[in-house]
């Protein structure tokens, strides 16, 4: 069981972390929604305990294990991961607003 202060700090941390990563990737790659597309893949790597090669060698077992782990996530874990997705989406919105107002990043 995760305590409430840890959940609150984790929510803020994931939001700020993925906002920052998304903002930097958006500036460098000039693709506004790159982090919002990459984030679900990052979440699957965070949730999964399988190695990447196991998804190629034995996909049935690996994806079944991943599906089971996704379904067994606690509400706090889902809330933390959703806050990271919100940070990635807000970074895309922020970079679009800055570009529309004439700011050129790199």
From Swiss-Prot:
Entry membrane topology: Multi-pass membrane protein
Name of this chain's protein: Uncharacterized membrane protein YuiB
Cellular component terms per the entry's GO annotation: plasma membrane
TM stretches of this protein: 4-24, 27-47, 78-98
Native organism taxonomy: Bacteria, Bacillati, Bacillota, Bacilli, Bacillales
Magnesium among keywords: no
UniProt keyword terms in alphabetical order: Cell membrane, Membrane, Transmembrane, Transmembrane helix
UniProt keyword Lyase, yes or no: no
Cellular compartment(s): Cell membrane
